[in-house]
């Protein structure tokens, strides 16, 4: 299974982006719990979730920086 593409994250709306970030954080928590109790069947899911979270947070940061530069603060 290939890693998710960042272009998919860039297509999300702001609200959906926040929802996805929350969902991936919950998924990572569950995966860490499974890893600690040695119940993790597919260890690659952990890497995919971390990769997806990094992509989503990158897109969120890009949008915040773009919004800050477009509206000058006085």
Curated annotation (Swiss-Prot):
InterPro entries: Ribosomal_protein_uL29, Ribosomal_uL29, Ribosomal_uL29_CS, Ribosomal_uL29_sf. Keywords: Ribonucleoprotein, Ribosomal protein. The keyword Ribosomal protein applies. Pfam families: Ribosomal_L29 (PF00831). PROSITE patterns: RIBOSOMAL_L29. It comes from the Bacteria. One of its GO terms (molecular function) is structural constituent of ribosome. One of its GO terms (biological process) is translation. GO terms for cellular component: cytosolic large ribosomal subunit. CDD domains: Ribosomal_L29_HIP (cd00427). Belongs to the universal ribosomal protein uL29 family. HAMAP family: Ribosomal_uL29 (MF_00374). PANTHER family: 60S RIBOSOMAL PROTEIN L35/50S RIBOSOMAL PROTEIN L29 (PTHR10916), LARGE RIBOSOMAL SUBUNIT PROTEIN UL29C (PTHR10916:SF0). This is Large ribosomal subunit protein uL29. The lineage of its organism: Bacteria, Bacillati, Cyanobacteriota, Cyanophyceae, Nostocales.
């Amino acid at each position: 299974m290939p890693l998710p593409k960042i272009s998919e994250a860039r297509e999300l709306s702001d609200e959906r982006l926040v929802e996805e970030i929350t969902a991936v954080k919950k998924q990572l928590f569950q995966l860490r719990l499974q890893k600690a109790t040695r119940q993790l069947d597919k260890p690659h899911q952990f890497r995919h979730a971390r990769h997806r979270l990094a992509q989503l947070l990158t897109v969120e940061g890009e949008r915040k920086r773009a919004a800050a530069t477009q509206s000058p603060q006085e």
